[in-house]
Amino acid sequence: MAANPRKILVTCALPYANGSIHLGHMLEHVQADIWVRYQRLRGNEVHFICADDAHGTPIMLKAQQMGMEPEQMIEEVSKEHQADFAGFDISFDNYHSTHSDENRELASFVYTQLKDKGYITNRTISQLFDPEKEMFLPDRFVKGTCPKCKAEDQYGDNCDNCGETYSPTDLIDPKSAVSGATPIMKDSEHFFFDLPQFEDMLKAWTKSGALQTETSNKMQEWFESGLHQWDISRDAPYFGFEIPGETSKYFYVWLDAPIGYMGSFKNLCDKRDDLDFDEFWKKDSTTELYHFIGKDIVYFHSLFWPAMLEGAGFRKPNNVFVHGYVTVNGAKMSKSKGTFIKAGTYLEHLDPECLRYYYAAKLNSRIDDLDLNLEDFTQRVNSDVVNKIVNLASRNAGFITKRFDGKLSETFAEPELYAEFANAADRIAELYETREFSRAIREITALADKANQYIDEKAPWVVAKQEGKDQELQDICSVGINLFRVLITYLKPVMPLLTERTEAFLNETLTWEGVAQPLTNHEVTKFKALFTRIDPKHVEAMVEASKEDAAAAQVLIEAAKPTGPLIDEPIEAEIEFDDFAKVDMRIAKIISCEAVPKANKLLKFQLDIGGEMRQVFSGIKSAYTPEELVGKHTVMVANLKPRKMKFGMSEGMILAAGPGGKDLWILEPHEGAQPGMRVM
């Protein structure tokens, strides 16, 4: 236990609640979890929290596509996210949602504090507006032709083809990605956070060591280009929190999303009696706060977030740890290639500890992209974890169990060798602390090589066959198992499940301090397989399943596309003109109309078709009252063979259009058309 335990609050970026967790997300959560588990292993008090980012236009629109309320959708997504994180043994103390009472209260409090201190301004701006959906369009919901390279179907903020950035109003032939309509410009009052007022504070903070060198340098570029006021409001319709004191104005998702860190911690504090929210968030807090994020959201966490905290009277983070992107097999993750792999799909095929180890073996403290090469992944895990580390135990445990009733030697035979392993603790600890996980793994595997070299040289399988060598055999195997024990202790933050199985075998809870002394005269349990090597066939199956996931998702996307009359009811097969000519359609005047007793849908008509009266029954009662129709002109099929019905003879058919129910409209001719005229 640490003499003076640190009090640490750790967060991961909040996953957006409109899709599944994939292996790109998992990089960050594994990285943070390894660091958190290391801190706990050293006796520090750590609170590890996260939440779903559950607001914004994309969530509102996806819920509409799925035919459900946003609240229902984000609840279902949250369950899936939490199951995925649990599957990878991410040890959150609390997982919450930005759509919560705690977050609403805190977002309102932060906004009010900023407003009262003069950091909120308002002005009228012009934005693109979808006239069909009656909503303002975020940049990513406008598509058109790039003004620079003329590539079609580009988003409203930048071109994927040439990389140009621009305003959505610069697009050629812009269209709403929601409805396909041509957007119009419309004015609206918006609220802005006055970020430039915090420039001096931010310049000092970004150079204080609170950011990685690469991030700090990037901040200086943004300072040189000038800070701008930040639009923190959105107009209805919008799924989020209404701005206090305003009508149909909502907080932009990036205002309440980082406050979600506070909301999740507040939710945890309310569940426990031993946690004080203010101790961790007050301006003069002596606790530590760390955010793990991806490089795509640096701007928000390094400028807006610390400025909001400063303005509202809260503490700022000690550090923001930024990581790069994940590529697979040297390229961007691809759905068609099966390398866009969901966390759930991975868990159906492979052990989560394999990915945790591989990520650790490649992670460092810089903002480098990490490539998940699936062939290297298989080879490295099998070589390092199975052949070098776990095999060390299996090579020795059998002899200890069968020949010595599970008892290790009373004295340790190789104190100098053990000291070399134990003395690596401080070096490896520093690497974990500074997030140089790949270097820590290299140190551990180098020690594993030495341990295996010792066993190879001593050859216990040979000694076991020699008379009078029992003590030597017990000593060799006890050394091997003790070295294995040290290696697994060092791997405990990375591979918690392997550690649990090892602790059961060793009959001991592994602690960092415990590596200082070997186990002697200690009884271990019967050895069971601790880890299974990766079968390349399982990797291939995962890739194929990811292709199937992508295909299934495309089916859902197609199913969710906007529908229309031609989609819902396609045009029938072509007919010859002679077939059409057989249909005699005439203008008819509605002389009388009445409801049919005991009939839910039928109206009874008397129609004048130019000197001849016709009685017709029509199923449009749900759309019209009889009184609305009397005196109108309409179109009927006049040569339809009369049909005897329960309520009388129907001598034709009135033409109407629409999907049914209340949405039916009879056909009405222009003025001048007379009863009996033929419709050509």
Swiss-Prot record:
It holds the Pfam family Anticodon_3. The lineage of its organism: Bacteria, Pseudomonadati, Pseudomonadota, Gammaproteobacteria, Vibrionales. It comes from Photobacterium profundum (strain SS9). InterPro entries: aa-tRNA-synth_I_CS, Anticodon_Met, Met-tRNA-synth_bsu_C, Met-tRNA_ligase_1, Met-tRNA_synth, Methionyl/Leucyl_tRNA_Synth, MetRS_core, MetRS_Zn. A motif ('HIGH' region) lies at residues 15-25. Zn(2+) binds at C146, C149, C159, C162. It catalyses: tRNA(Met) + L-methionine + ATP = L-methionyl-tRNA(Met) + AMP + diphosphate. It is found in: Cytoplasm. This is Methionine--tRNA ligase. Binds 1 zinc ion per subunit.
